[in-house]
Amino acid sequence: ANVGSVYYSSDQFLNLSAINPAFNLLASMEFGEKYEDEFDFFPEEQRASLMEGMYATADTATVSVLNTKRPNILFIFMESFGSTMIERQGGVKGVAPSLDRLASEGVFFSNLYANSFRTDRGTVCTYSAYPGLPTLSIMKVPNIARKLPNIAQSLGKAGYQTDFLYGGDINFTNMRGYLMAGGFQKLTSQDDFSMHDRNYSKWGVPDNITFKRLLAMLKEREGQKEPWFTAFLTLSSHEPFEVPFKKFEDKHRNAFAFTDDCIGKFIKEFRKSPQWDNTLIVLLPD
């Protein structure tokens, strides 16, 4: 049940009041089946032993890579952009020169994996630190999703302005409901773009246009004292790979090259902003 489509307020009581209770009850019945036996591979003691090593931390001083304690944070979630398209990771040559260049300029994590296999699961994994489940999308279960911690909620409590930008249908897989419950104060989606911008691809607004919107949004904040956290989910490297760009004959590679080109142009322009020196930019494939 995509109940997030009726969410309209930062007050979750009001959002929950807008849900049809009878419909919600019937929809929740599909989650009654239990799947524990299908994925219960190890005894509890062995599971605890395996997990213990993952949480080990070195007893050393933390090395800071920032020049401020309250930086602006721009999180760019790159649709489907795995290492197969990154040359320095052994991927296809020439597809992502911008990302290859940025990797050498910043801090590059070469052995980092998301615990998910779809964007809805990867989003929850990234913002809420909740691992993607094999048979169930937590984003589609509002009663669970709204109770999860969220980086937007934490930063909001710390005085940050929080917002989310996506050029597609933000109601898909109940994304709107999850994001609003998670503390994102403003959402921008395909509904906030003209029909002309939306008509190029059936999946939504192409990345060159959404990156321009992102740049305009950030420019409006120049001079404001309140720090901000902006999350941006790209779109064009998703099938059907319809992009206003021609570098490769292969549509798949060409779409990824287009997103990379958009990222490179955005970074080039944002470097000119007075906010550049006080902004942490994180790029992560979904």
Feature roles, as predicted:
Residues 2-285:
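Soluble catalytic regions of membrane-associated enzymes that act on cell-envelope
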